[in-house]
Amino acid sequence: MSRENQVRQSLFDIERALRESPFWQVVPPEEEAFNSTEPFSLDTMKPEEWLQWVFLPRMHALLDSELALPRSWFYCLILKKRWKGRQKRPRRFCCVSSSSMSYSPPMYRMAQCTMLEIIYQDEHLVAVNKPSGWLVHRSWLDRKEKVVVMQTVRDQIGQHVYTVHRLDRPTSGVLLLALSSEVARALSQQFESHQMQKTYHAVVRGYVLDDGVIDYALTEELDKIADKFTNPDKAPQPAVTHYRSLAQAEMPVAIGRYPTARYSLMELKPQTGRKHQLRRHMSHIHHPIIGDTAHGDLRHNRGMESHFSCGRLMLHASELQLNHPVSGQPLTLQARWDAPWQGVVTQFGWKGILPEFEGVEFPADSGQDSEHFVEQ
């Protein structure tokens, strides 16, 4: 067995042992934790967190890059007692420099062996329940990303897929993909002409007691790298979001200067499709979405993770209504909440309010279709 294969096998052994231990985490640390300059991120992470979210992904990415391995590095083989048939004392970890590779936290390496939940599939299109933390597809900024929805779906169904729309990386829920370029164009036209109705659910800070419409124009959010040649002086674009308050909860935990924390479960229906529209609109009315690191409340984000074991963005694309691009029949596609979402719903006393989204979790390697759609 080559040295590379030995290293890879040892990495899988470490990952399997970690999964079987009580230290395995489904929710990654806060994004700020990955900015540590200390060895092993000792000032921001626990050792088991660093092992799962930094060491293992970087090692896998380094192996996948097919670069020559330095002979002086034994990597995870230092955790084994045998090397080339000889007894060895366990040695210390050798930290992999971030300069040797590209790594964007959080990297869900475990997802590479997980099949996505298929909501709907026929000979023309497929819809999946996109997990939080997954990219829809690679771009030149993250071309080395190993876990992307399009590649996973392609491998899962054995057929090329085409993008129709996108969900932000931290957002979960219904993602529609076409199985031909013609169908992709037809579906894209439906999106552009606002013929599809999208419904999101979100958990926001504070009590929202009424329903309403947010009609607030948004300037374009530019990426410092990807949009560096884009005109920054574009006029604000119209943006409209309809919202409905579904439930409220007051939890006995002190966050900031308040002795309790208040939250609301919201239904959001965007009439337009501006970048980060729902996040920016909810922040505009002073009820930011929990887990939003760009427009949200950092104290509540941390409080949600520390008190309720949920560190993800609490925004889920729950439902998509459209006309089938070939048959013309109405389709309603629904995506269920993941385990962190379900945990918050249960702890906040909201269970049963939206039972259609409270489905049981699939086994990680089942690949079973959910058939969670309504054909009208």
Curated annotation (Swiss-Prot):
Q: Which reaction does it catalyse?
A: uridine(65) in tRNA = pseudouridine(65) in tRNA
One of the Pfam families matching this protein, by short name: PseudoU_synth_2
Q: Which domain of life is it from?
A: Bacteria
Species the sequence originates in: Pectobacterium carotovorum subsp. carotovorum (Erwinia carotovora subsp. carotovora)
Q: Which family does it belong to?
A: In the C-terminal section; belongs to the pseudouridine synthase RluA family.
Q: What is its EC number?
A: 5.4.99.26
Q: Which PROSITE patterns does its entry note?
A: PSI_RLU (PS01129)
State if tRNA processing is listed as a keyword. yes
The protein's gene is named truC
Q: Name the Gene Ontology biological process terms.
A: enzyme-directed rRNA pseudouridine synthesis; tRNA processing
- GO MF terms held by the record: RNA binding; tRNA pseudouridine(65) synthase activity
Q: Where is the active site?
A: D168
Name of this protein: tRNA pseudouridine synthase C
Q: Does the keyword Isomerase apply?
A: yes
Q: Which UniProt keywords apply?
A: Isomerase, tRNA processing
Q: What does this chain do?
A: Responsible for synthesis of pseudouridine from uracil-65 in transfer RNAs.
InterPro entries for the chain: PsdUridine_synth_cat_dom_sf, PsdUridine_synth_RluA-like_CS, PsdUridine_synth_RsuA/RluA, RluA_PseudoU_synthase, YqcC-like_dom, YqcC-like_sf
